[in-house]
Design a protein with these regions (language model features):
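Short glycine-rich, low-complexity segments
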Residues: 1-30, 76, 82
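Short, surface-exposed linear segments at secondary-structure transitions and domain or protein termini
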Residues: 1, 38-49, 75-82
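Acidic, low-complexity, intrinsically disordered interaction modules
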Residues: 26-65
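Short, compact, well-ordered microdomains
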Residues: 60-82
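Assembly/interface hotspot detector across virion components, adhesins/toxins, and nucleic-acid enzymes
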Residues: 3, 19-21, 45-47, 55-59, ...
Length: 82
């Protein structure tokens, strides 16, 4: 998936307070949680998008980080908090 498309989707999720589920080619799933209502997943503090290296870095409030190659992303699903 193109990094600029990913950037637009994740920025919308941040602004709107959504949960975004990122599905990778190998079947793994990662979550970006900007919702204040969904407590099932750790809240996301920030996202860093490195367009040059096609790298998405998800930084959670508990200090954990996910590093994802944007070329391995096949689907992003977002939904409002319940």
């Amino acid at each position: 998936m193109k990094i600029d498309v990913i950037k637009n989707i994740l920025e919308d999720a941040k602004v709107c307070g959504l949960l975004a589920t990122i599905t990778l080619v190998n079947g793994q799933v990662s979550h970006v949680n900007f919702s204040k209502h969904i407590k099932t997943f750790t809240a996301t503090d920030d996202i860093i998008l490195d367009e040059e290296r096609h790298l998405v870095t998800i930084i959670d409030t508990d200090g954990s980080r996910d590093y994802i190659d944007s070329d391995s992303i096949i689907r992003i699903f977002s939904k409002e908090g319940l």
